[in-house]
Amino acid sequence: MDPLNRSQLGPGCKTQAVVQKGPLDLIETGQGLKVQTDKPHLVSLGSGRLSTAITLLPLEEGRTVIGSAARDISLQGPGLAPEHCYIENLRGTLTLYPCGNACTIDGLPVRQPTRLTQGCMLCLGQSTFLRFNHPAEAKWMKSMIPAGVRAPGPTYNPGSAESESLVNGNHTAQPATRAPSACASHSSLVSSIEKDLQEIMDSLVLEEPGAAGKKPAATSPLSPMANGGRYLLSPPTSPGAMSVGSSYENTSPAFSPLSSPASSGSCASHSPSGQEPGPSVPPLVPARSSSYHLALQPPQSRPSGSRSSDSPRLGRKGGHERPPSPGLRGLLTDSPAATVLAEARRTTESPRLGGQLPVVAISLSEYPSSGARSQPASIPGSPKFQSPVPAPRNKIGTLQDRPPSPFREPPGTERVLTSSPSRQLVGRTFSDGLAATRTLQPPESPRLGRRGLDSMRELPPLSPSLSRRALSPLPARTAPDPKLSREVAESPRPRRWAAHGTSPEDFSLTLGARGRRTRSPSPTLGESLAPRKGSFSGRLSPAYSLGSLTGASPRQSPRAQRKLSSGDLRVPIPRERKNSITEISDNEDELLEYHRRQRQERLREQEMERLERQRLETILNLCAEYSRADGGPETGELPSIGEATAALALAGRRPSRGLAGAIVVSGRCGEESGGASQRLWESMERSDEENLKEECSSTESTQQEHEDAPGAKHQGEVLAVEEERAQVLGRVEQLKIRVKELEQQLQEAAREAEMERALLQGEREAERASLQKEQRAVDQLQEKLVALETGIQKDRDKEADALETETKLFEDLEFQQLERESRVEEERELAGQGLLRSKAELLRSVSKRKERLAVLDSQAGQIRAQAVQESERLAREKNAALQLLQKEKEKLNVLERRYHSLTGGRPFPKTTSTLKEMEKLLLPAVDLEQWYQELMSGLGTGLAAASPRSSPPPLPAKASRQLQVYRSKMDSDAASPLPRTRSGPLPSSSGSSSSSSQLSVATLGRSPSPKSALLAQNGTSSLPRNLAATLQDIETKRQLALQQKGHQVIEEQRRRLAELKQKAAAEAQCQWDALHGAGPFSAGPSGFPALMHHSILHHLPAGRERGEEGEHAYDTLSLESSDSMETSISTGGNSACSPDNMSSASGLDMGKIEEMEKMLKEAHAEKSRLMESREREMELRRQALEEERRRREQVERRLQSESARRQQLVEKEVKLREKQFSQARPLTRYLPNRKEDFDLKTHIESSGHGVDTCLHVVLSSKVCRGYLIKMGGKIKSWKKRWFVFDRLKRTLSYYVDKHETKLKGVIYFQAIEEVYYDHLRSAAKSPNPALTFCVKTHDRLYYMVAPSAEAMRIWMDVIVTGAEGYTQFMN
């Protein structure tokens, strides 16, 4: 290979390998060899004349760097940089980035990124040539070429005369041949849009067959292809076309602000919406070599200029929504223009193009009209001029056609858009490039129908795209045919042309001549048009290079004709188009202002329409009067004018009929179409000549009859007959035209069906190609899917194996965890049992100690009873001594009185000592009262402080009972040992409820015997009598002593009283300390001192005078004693209450008795209060017990719910294990049973097993025996063993035989975890896998085979009752 082309090392080998890997086809074609591949590539032609090899350089997806030292494609040649440029392949679209180095595409230097198109020539550096091939684009372009059309390569002629002035298809101004073009600055957006459109238009270069042979390439400096065209475009060569003038001038630069969107209404659009190409658009095919291209106006600058349908199917539907215009398609079908139109329509509607391929407007003006038959300027009374619209259609040029903008309809424009997309396309195509033909149509709205040449001033300048389009007309045919101009309206009412190919100037003169003869309102029309006839063939102004001047249109009002006739034929000055919708930005206020102006304009035009309709009616009335009043040779022509004005009025009243279709005037090309139209016109002319002859003869005969008539009475009848005949002739003419129109409609329907078939065929081919492509993609995806599924299956198998291994490991870990938990649970259970045992021992010890205390309390009670008896005996002795003392005192008094009387008032010498002894006996009594008061107050506060919860408030009746205390004090003086021995035990506290304390309280409460109580009451009942006498004596002797001793005695008493107070306080403090010291030991019954006076017990709080439990509590105050005291007082059954003593009682004694009765009543009331308080306390205790019971029930419920929740958690965990692991073991039906009275045989029989019918199992209430085959632990051998399940020993043992002499192994119940059927068949070489079950322990897994299925089920249910290895399954 040539070293200048490509290096053989490094990337070169890689590139060759890439090309060889792709589908590279070597095809022998005779003596040649064709190399073909499917990928985009560059064909290197070498760097100079010395290069001999041809290299294919593939362009892979992504970036490919080219240069003398590039890593991808290395080329050697003059002017090549190390990294000269790079080509980026992005999904089939290849773009060249020059990197600032010398690069040309098709001879044009490029300085910025440029898209590469099929067949373009690249020159890198000075002489390194590369051809770019894109097989996909080429294949797609070939598929788009219709059948029978070939696309020869255009001539590469850089030396053409005009090539210097053409860049990217735009003409630059030539000083010698062209007027200077306006230079407008382009915005960046417009430049980018123009550049994109240039690429799009570069992509579609095709030729029509035979064009190259008919016309040499040298005469076509322009590209023979433009814009997707397949339509031949060349400069005009006919004189008629060249007479237009400034056909090759651009009035403004491309995409200048003057080219408004609406000014290019007939410009072929990309798509109805003018949007960017969709993703389905294949790579566009560019032009190559020196093909110069036309840049059409982009769709972005035409917001609503196109009304074509979105899809061919929609377009075909829309084509039948309105009545077809037969004349239109009759003109277009049998000619090369028809082929052009069909292809243009397919180009527009094909979905494969994605709405991106512009339609080329074909100018048929190049065909000379040398064979056109001109009619005389004036034919008076000719019926052929009585057609409904006798106005010229063939004009010198077309008004600038604009699409119907939804926001503004410029005045004076003439529509080419139709409601049918097919007609729309035809009208648009034939209206863009017309240079010598005139396009007219019925008005789309009333304001268009009355605009004539006077509204041309309001038109903006022509779109530069139209101007550029005029630069590329069709090549002139060598044998031109007569060109016929005709238009048939879309409405079923035909409008026939009267001008058969005549020039617009001649026909304007003809109309003017007729107007003069018929007294037209514009009599000088011919004279005004004649002087300007020569100017029509000269150069027009640039703004009207495509035919801005026009005569009166068929919808033109007489006012416009008057303007024409008055000589106002000034050429309007080109103006900038203001208030265009495209010049309005996104500002909402400007849009609102724009719509307001448009609305006012529409209102003005509607008013003008109404005025013009009135004017037309006035003209009709004048014509009718004139025809009746006038006579002569011109009467035959009046109905023609009348009908014309009527048709004008009708068209003015029906503006909507013109909205549907555009009526195109154009010449036909092609021999067949020319002959057909010629025959049609010849037949119509023959009928017109016959009508003319008939009319002339009738006119002559009428004139002769008029001359020969004897009078004027027949003249009115003759006029009526002539008028009726003219009407009949008009109707006949219309019927003929209607018949011809129906024939043309038939032909048009056939042609349209053929066109539809061709469109569908092309669409079908495109869809088939897409289908094949997608099918291949589907096959590739299917292969990838199969490979992916295979890989996924392998990965899934690997993951499943890994998961199974992990599952086994997890299961082992779970077993170990469960074993640990079971051991911990067992240890916890053992510790709990030990604690319960120690608690029971402590409770037993407490109960024993309470019993001991009860015994001690009973002994203390007995001791107290003995002490009470002793005190009573001493009290009796004391009473007897006191009685003797009293008697002795009485005797002493008698002696003293006698001695006083005998001695004359001198006392005994020992009187003071006696008084001192009496004071010693009396003063401690006073101190004792204070001591009792202090003691009771101390006891009350101490008890209240010791038990504030359980003690009721102190009784109010006992607060000021001083007399009772005084009596008890005196009682204690009278019977000194008694107060110290009578005592009651301290009741147990309210918080204690033990039986021992209740027993001690009950025992101590009953301890005083009735006899001792009676003795005590006898001693007490005898107190008042002795007390009265004693007090009287004491009082008298005390007063005597006070008189004698005075202050000395008082001081002594105070001293002794203070000492007694100190002693009482010390004793009360000791008792208080003893009381508080015994307070915490509430179980102890002896909190008070052992010797306590019974009157103190009267003042104890009720809560301390009874036990805790109501059924065992006894009042320590003996109420029976008070009752007996009352009884003894009433009956007087005591020796101390003898009538002798009662006789000595004074009135003071009676008051004291009443006081004691009051005290008894108070005691009864206190007893009732004590009973009530006892009931209240019992109620409180009952409530406390009830609350305690409720609390225990709540705790039990919580415990049950907690245990149920724990059970649910365990079951859930088991279920999760079942779901997660494929080797999860089935749960056994029964949990272990540890009850000692559990009957194994009954349990098995209740489970549904037939124990008696199974001979392989010996079952009793505690033991199960039978033969099983067991697999060995170390050596996996199966041996028959005799198994014994013993619930007494809590073991599962197995022996060599049933004699149970040689023990082989023992399984303890606590080691058995689970018993389950071997559903996984994991036992190796099992004798019978269907009868194999497993016993899992902490250490190993036992496999056993039962002799029968029933035996296996029995053994499994038996062993599971001893499976105590899993403690969480137990309650």
Swiss-Prot record:
Residue ranges of every copy of the FHA domain listed in the record: 64-125
Disulphide bonds in the chain = none
**Basic and acidic residues bias (residue ranges):** 483-493, 682-696, 703-714
Record bears the keyword Phosphoprotein: yes
Low complexity bias located where? 252-273, 296-312, 464-477, 976-997
Alphabetically sorted, this entry's keywords are: Coiled coil, Methylation, Phosphoprotein
Asymmetric dimethylarginine-modified residues are where? R131
Name of this chain's protein: Pleckstrin homology-like domain family B member 1
Q: Which organism is it from?
A: Mus musculus (Mouse)
